[in-house]
Amino acid sequence: MKILVQESLSAKQIEAAFRLWNNEYPEKLKFDKIEGFNDYLNNLDAKKHFLLIDAQDVIVGWSATFLRDNERWFAIILNSDVQGKSYGTSILNEIKKHENRLAGWAIDRDGVLRADGHMYKSPLQFYIKNGFNVQADNRIESERISAVKITWQLNAH
């Protein structure tokens, strides 16, 4: 596996990230059309993409960092076939080489359905294991998502 770091994505890479998003994230976060995903990407400020590529040159993971409300935020998605094999940690470690602080939303409850009918497993413990702090008093609650804010800071103890 290799990780590519890019400021923009090709049409093929956007399509792969779109498929990952719709296959792996909860169904309520699904984009109906690739144009909606493209709009999402185009509205991210100062973005950087991190692509996890397998031996057959298939994109099996995508992450992006971006500026929102004067903070560096991130999103990350791995194909479920490669989850639990340290590849998510590898991408986070690569991101941490480029950032001093990160913020994100983590769904902190199990029982949410993915589009394929399988359960979405909360990644919260994964983030805690990778040095993130849970901001329990900072939540997003909507019809589409229930999540807690997570943060990471270089050399935070």
Regions found by a protein language model. Give the residues of each.
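Short amphipathic alpha-helix that is part of the acyltransferase structural core
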Residues: 1-35
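Active-site rim helix/loop that mediates acceptor-substrate recognition in acyltransferases
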Residues: 26-50
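Conserved beta-strand in the GNAT
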Residues: 51, 57-66, 72-77
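A short, internal acetyl-CoA/4′-phosphopantetheine-binding micro-motif in the GNAT/acyltransferase core
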Residues: 75-84, 108-111
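Conserved acetyl-CoA-binding loop-helix of GNAT-fold acetyltransferases
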Residues: 84-97, 119-122
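Conserved GNAT acetyl-CoA-binding A-motif
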Residues: 97-115
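Conserved active-site alpha-helix within GNAT-family acetyltransferase domains
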Residues: 109-136
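Short glycine/proline-centered loop/turn elements that form peptide/ligand docking sites
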Residues: 121-123, 139-147
